[in-house]
């Protein structure tokens, strides 16, 4: 996760900036959707969550060999969240490694790894059925080939960096 931390901080200037958010930037349409939170009746609109802020979007799976990366992602969220970086995990079973129930996935994320950043309920991240967020991201960068692919988006919603599963 060190490479990710350094790249995010340097690319976005977060390390020296007390708070990074450009509220004047219009939220891109692909983020303007109500998405179900993991194991919750609540939804989140990414425009409300991240308008004008850089965002790290990650496809996750609770039974993947890379699941330990939740610790590093949480550290990134804790370290740079107050400065404006928004971390969002999209649980997905596209690679057949997500828990059978949302309750189990939530236990792994929230209890086992202490995740406090926003987690979206299991949804497709590849192919024709990908969520609007990932459909757009996949047009800008390579679609995820595996779980825990990370995309760093600037405040305008543009992908500025893609990190493969092994970056952690």
Positions of the model-derived regions?
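N-proximal helix/coil linker or "cap" segments that precede and/or mark the start of modular domains
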Residues: 18-33, 50
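Rossmann-fold NAD(P)H-dependent dehydrogenase/reductase core
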Residues: 26-43, 66, 128
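Structural microenvironment flanking redox-active thiols in thiol-disulfide oxidoreductases
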Residues: 66-130
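Loop/turn elements at helix/coil->beta-strand transitions in domains of secreted/extracellular proteins
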Residues: 51-55, 81-86, 113-118, 147-148, ...
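Thiol/disulfide oxidoreductase modules built on the thioredoxin-like
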Residues: 113-115, 124-168
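A short beta-strand-turn-helix
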Residues: 33-54, 75-80
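Bacterial N-terminal signal peptides
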Residues: 3-15
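Amphipathic alpha-helical repeat scaffolds
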Residues: 59-63
């Amino acid at each position: 996760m060190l490479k990710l931390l350094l790249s995010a901080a340097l690319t976005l200037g977060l390390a020296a900036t007390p708070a990074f958010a450009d509220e004047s930037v219009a939220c891109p349409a692909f983020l303007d959707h109500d998405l179900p939170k993991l194991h919750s009746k609540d939804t989140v609109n990414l425009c409300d969550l991240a308008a004008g802020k850089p965002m790290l979007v990650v496809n996750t799976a609770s039974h993947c060999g890379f699941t330990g990366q939740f610790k590093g992602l949480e550290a990134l969220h804790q370290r740079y969240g107050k400065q404006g970086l928004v971390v969002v995990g999209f649980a997905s079973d596209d690679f057949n490694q997500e828990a059978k129930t949302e309750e189990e996935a939530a236990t792994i994320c929230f209890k086992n790894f202490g995740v406090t950043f926003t987690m979206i309920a299991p949804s497709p991240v590849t192919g024709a059925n990908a969520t609007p967020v990932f459909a757009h991201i996949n047009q800008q960068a390579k679609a995820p080939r595996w779980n825990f692919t990370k995309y760093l988006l600037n405040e305008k919603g543009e992908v500025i960096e893609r990190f493969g599963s092994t970056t952690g």
